[in-house]
Amino acid sequence: MKFELNGKIIFSKEITDDAKKDIIEVLNDRTILLKGVPTGKEEEASKIVNYEFKGNELILNIISGTYARAHEAIIRLKKPIMEKVGKIHKMGIRDIKIDNYEITINAPHNIDALENLKVPECETELNEEENTIKIIFKNIGDSELKRNIVDRAIKFVKTEIDNIGDSGEECDLTYEVCGIAPNTIVSEYKAERTISYNKDPTEESEKLGWVKRFSGKGQWFYTPPMTKLLRAFEELLMEECINKIGFDECLFPKLIPLEVMYKMRYLEGLPEGMYYVSPPKRDPEMFKEFVNEMMIKNEIPIHKLKDLLRNPGYVLAPAQCEPFYQFFDHELVDIDNPVKFVDKSGWTYRWEGGGSKGLDRVHEFLRIETVQMGAPEFVNSVRDDTLKYAEKLAEKLDLEYWTEVGDDPFYLEGRKKEERNIEFPEVPKYEMRLWLPHVKDERKGVAVTSANVHGTHFVEGFGVKDYKNRTVWTGCTGFGLSRWVIGFLAQYGFDYNDWPELIKDKIGEMPNIPKVITWPKK
């Protein structure tokens, strides 16, 4: 790497000739910039190429290689200069400013894959002939340097370079971590009966009035028949899977502070997949203007509403297990007394963009979430049990399924690099899918159970420790109620008489849809 800096140290008053002599003495002392540089790497250290005095400013041109980088050098000069001139000349340093700072980083291959790379706080230039990327900072001061934005930008770019494989495609952290190739099928079950139903369950649900599209994107109103079926599956999953493993029920918050998502590193991986929440300002007078304009114009004045909202401070829970890790934030635990919690208290939210179509991929969905914390062996065992009992339930219902190694564990999704010393499991995620026979072009399934082990990912992020300093892992399993129902209806259809006794016993008598003249449309 090459670093070239043009900046200045700004003093509290004009620099006198005597002060200049003392400052020059400091600038000529190479030991200041060689401190900490390994023997034999002196040429990589910072060098002051040029300097000049102008009023109360010391203008510097500094170059360096990897060691004692130029931006570190200008900060390093501050203390010895002050020791030399502070008391004697009664002057202080007011600020450090970098007017222009160019950092050239070598990229071994496929530099064109970074063509659209954007780095916050700086500009980028690609040189495809030399396979280098240059990041350029302009007009940054002491406060930015103290926040280490330069080092973070360098680290960010180097990570992006490392993530570009020989093919020029981005590498995914999931594929790097997995001991078994993602999408490998590890178990499957073929239905014993002949599955003849082949209609789209979303379309049929709408025709029958079991659901109605809500005005929000990816949202549905579930009417009594669909709700009855959802609750039946909720009971079955609790009885046949979760209670057998001994989870204790909790009520998890669903409004999650952004700082929790930051510690989870969810904001790195899938920031575009969440609903962000902005609390309102508590100013009745300002809202009175909003209401008045709405009543006069007979429309919602969105522009005015934006001004009445604070910055986003929360997200609607996209993973459901977020509060579990915050609960243990910086706590001492005992892995001899592991924890198993389950939450089924409300909706989960994902922004799917254009990916939301039918009932199998929605923005607002119900699921049962189990979470466990303990020794690695315990966490793996519990995860495997949740999957085993889910598969057994599907077999009891004669639902055709397969289980595969997941290619998108939620805590790794969208992430390209892990710079911390994290322990990962051999398989971060198993995904169980129910077959959708109405999809003709391919053998497609709906993911109904996602069984995850996180290793030390969340333990590290939330500072959780065992009181004997033993290894602590976490894991979670999500049972998607809506998706279990869709997979069931896709294979059995909507005729109650064709359903298995296990389901009919839970439901009893099916309720009717509300009588509305204009709905459902025939």
From Swiss-Prot:
Xref: SUPFAM superfamilies: Class II aaRS and biotin synthetases
Gene Ontology biological process terms, A to Z: selenocysteine biosynthetic process; seryl-tRNA aminoacylation
Xref: InterPro entries: aa-tRNA-synt_IIb, aa-tRNA-synth_II/BPL/LPL, Ser-tRNA-ligase_2_arc, SerS_tRNA-bd
GO cellular component: cytoplasm
Residues that hold Zn(2+) according to the record: 321, 369, 476
Cofactor needs: Zn(2+)
Residues bound to L-serine: 319, 350, 367-369
Binding site for ATP: 350-352, 361-362, 483
Subcellular location: Cytoplasm
Keywords recorded for this protein, A-Z: Aminoacyl-tRNA synthetase, ATP-binding, Cytoplasm, Ligase, Metal-binding, Nucleotide-binding, Protein biosynthesis, Zinc
Pathway field: Aminoacyl-tRNA biosynthesis; selenocysteinyl-tRNA(Sec) biosynthesis; L-seryl-tRNA(Sec) from L-serine and tRNA(Sec): step 1/1
Presence of the UniProt keyword Cytoplasm in the record: yes
Reaction(s) the record says it catalyses: tRNA(Ser) + L-serine + ATP = L-seryl-tRNA(Ser) + AMP + diphosphate + H(+); tRNA(Sec) + L-serine + ATP = L-seryl-tRNA(Sec) + AMP + diphosphate + H(+)
Enzyme Commission designation: 6.1.1.11
One Pfam entry name: tRNA-synt_2b
MF terms in GO: ATP binding; serine-tRNA ligase activity; zinc ion binding
Co-factor remark: Binds 1 Zn(2+) ion per subunit. This ion is coordinated with 2 cysteines, 1 glutamate and a water molecule that dissociates from the zinc ion to allow the coordination of the amino group of the serine substrate, which is essential for catalysis.
UniProt main location, coarse: cytoplasm
Class of the enzyme per the UniProt entry, highest EC level: ligase
Domain of life: Archaea
Domain-level remarks: Consists of two distinct domains, a catalytic core and a N-terminal extension that is presumably involved in tRNA binding.
Function: Catalyzes the attachment of serine to tRNA(Ser). Is also able to aminoacylate tRNA(Sec) with serine, to form the misacylated tRNA L-seryl-tRNA(Sec), which will be further converted into selenocysteinyl-tRNA(Sec).
Subunit note: Homodimer.
Stated family: Belongs to the class-II aminoacyl-tRNA synthetase family. Type-2 seryl-tRNA synthetase subfamily.
Name of the protein in question: Type-2 serine--tRNA ligase
Organism of derivation: Methanococcus aeolicus (strain ATCC BAA-1280 / DSM 17508 / OCM 812 / Nankai-3)
Organism lineage: Archaea, Methanobacteriati, Methanobacteriota, Methanomada group, Methanococci
Gene: serS
